[in-house]
Amino acid sequence: HGISRMYVRYFDVVADAGGRAVPNATLNFATAMPQDVDIVPTVFVMPECLRGDRKQLASLIVKRVLQMNETNDVNDVKEIQIDCDWTLSTRRPYNDFMQAMLDECHSRQLQLSSTIRLHQLAQTPPPADRGVLMMYNTGDATDIRCHKPILDLHDAAPYLPYLKDYKLSLSAAYPVFTW
């Protein structure tokens, strides 16, 4: 299929009962990763996890990703991606966290990318080497009246003018599945 790069969700970071950020739903490497494909470990961070020490969180995430790579023979990783559904109210702590992630990644010769949702295009971009615009989930998949919940260009169109002046290099992620 000509796939040269795979974004692989390694784990989520969620708040435990005490409000501490902890890893959850860690990937179980049942088979080896393909050796001829660039693997980009991706970590989903819940916004409420950004209330604590963001530098420590960044350090722990990078260390966990690197340990998972080593344990599972995932070699030559050049980039880590952070996925977070941040909003205007969580933008500042997210950007602080992303700056800590950027510093941590660069100290280890890694690049950092961030997912960018359509609604986030209207905000200042987070600190990152690049972004990946998520061109999917534009509708409500639980609403039977929504005919194109995965990608409806009509729903995406209001956000597209923000691309012209967006200050972060972006590539686009499109859905590659049907139902």
Where are these regions (language model features)?
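Residue-level marker of positions within ordered structural domains that often coincide
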Residues: 3, 11, 87, 136, ...
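N-terminal mature-domain "stem" immediately C-terminal to a signal peptide or N-terminal signal-anchor/transmembrane
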Residues: 1-10, 16
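Substrate-binding surface in catalytic domains of secreted glycosidases
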Residues: 92, 99-179
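Context-gated lysine
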Residues: 5, 55, 63, 78, ...
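Chitinase-like catalytic core of GlcNAc-active glycosidases
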Residues: 12-133
